[in-house]
Amino acid sequence: FRSPDGTYTYRVSSTDQAGNTTEVEVEAIELDTAPTKIFVTAGSDKLAPTGNGLYEEISFSTIVNRREGLESWQLEMVDQNGISQKTFSGEQRIPKEIIWDGKDENGEFIEGRYKARFSARYTKGNRPTAESLSFVLDVTPPQTEVSLNPVPFSPDNDGIDDELEISLDVSDTNSIQNWKF
């Protein structure tokens, strides 16, 4: 037997062989079986707070399908090792958008791949969680090395050091988006 959602009173009574009766009542028992689904999306797949005006912050949108009975919420920035580096939290009211500047709880940048983990706590006991797609926090510029051979070179068609060989070596902990020479 399944009871419909609603507010109930639980009453227990007993009578012994001598006819003595007692009754205990618990009021306002809330039965709520409605699902509590939550979602989080990252506004970008990269965060590079370097001061150049590109990808300085990352925004997160949260969706909660049910606000009734919401006690608290939490949005954690979790690194590739599963360690929470930054936490945003609150009671009941969830902002439509949460902005992260890339700094951990100590005000430092810890580079790497992250996910946002969103969780909520309801009075009825539900604890739904959701994760965003991953994104990269990168504040270190690529390492670039240029080498020339011969130095000096003399393009005078005398057959000695007329051609210049240029070698490039570019490395980064993340992928190189583009380059030009």
Please place each PLM-identified region on the residue numbering.
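Short loop/turn motifs at secondary-structure boundaries
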Residues: 1-181
